[in-house]
């Protein structure tokens, strides 16, 4: 999408190493009946500082990751927390900072906290920001951590 392309370009401009993988949904659901083919994949873009940690066990594996969609009613396109945890663990170490420029349902924030990373997220839609703030706060309260979430700007 245009938004992903724009974000990818900005990350590269700032000297980050940008990678791409595909999420293949093992249980896709149709958004509407007007399309002939069911969309069962989503592109994932992730970036890290050049020379930063990368889990050697993830090398030479397929860039297509199969994972079921997450059942979460607070957002139209929630990402699976387990998939976000895999991305985070493959490309960072505990105590590193994870940045999500499109927080959506908060899956990256929850995954970051579950894997002992700090988290910075941005969400343009105030409705989803508020939902995400509450969701992340509830998720991390179960692991004994407090979340400091800056108010919507």
What are these regions (language model features)?
Residues 1-130:
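Core catalytic lobe of class I
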Residues 133-153:
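S-adenosyl-L-methionine
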């Amino acid at each position: 999408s245009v938004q992903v392309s724009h974000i990818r370009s900005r990350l590269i401009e700032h000297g980050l190493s940008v990678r791409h993988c595909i999420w293949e949904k093992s249980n896709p659901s149709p958004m509407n009946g007007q399309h002939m083919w069911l969309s069962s994949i989503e592109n994932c873009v992730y970036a890290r500082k050049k020379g930063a940690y990368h889990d050697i066990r993830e090398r030479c594996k397929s860039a297509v990751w199969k994972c079921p969609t997450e059942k979460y009613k607070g957002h139209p396109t929630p990402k699976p927390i387990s998939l976000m945890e895999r991305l985070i663990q493959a490309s960072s170490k505990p105590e590193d900072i994870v940045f999500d420029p499109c927080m959506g349902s908060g899956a990256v924030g929850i995954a970051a906290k579950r894997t002992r990373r700090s988290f910075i997220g941005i969400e343009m839609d105030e409705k989803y920001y508020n939902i995400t703030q509450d969701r992340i706060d509830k998720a991390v309260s179960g692991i004994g951590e407090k979340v400091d979430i800056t108010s919507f700007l």
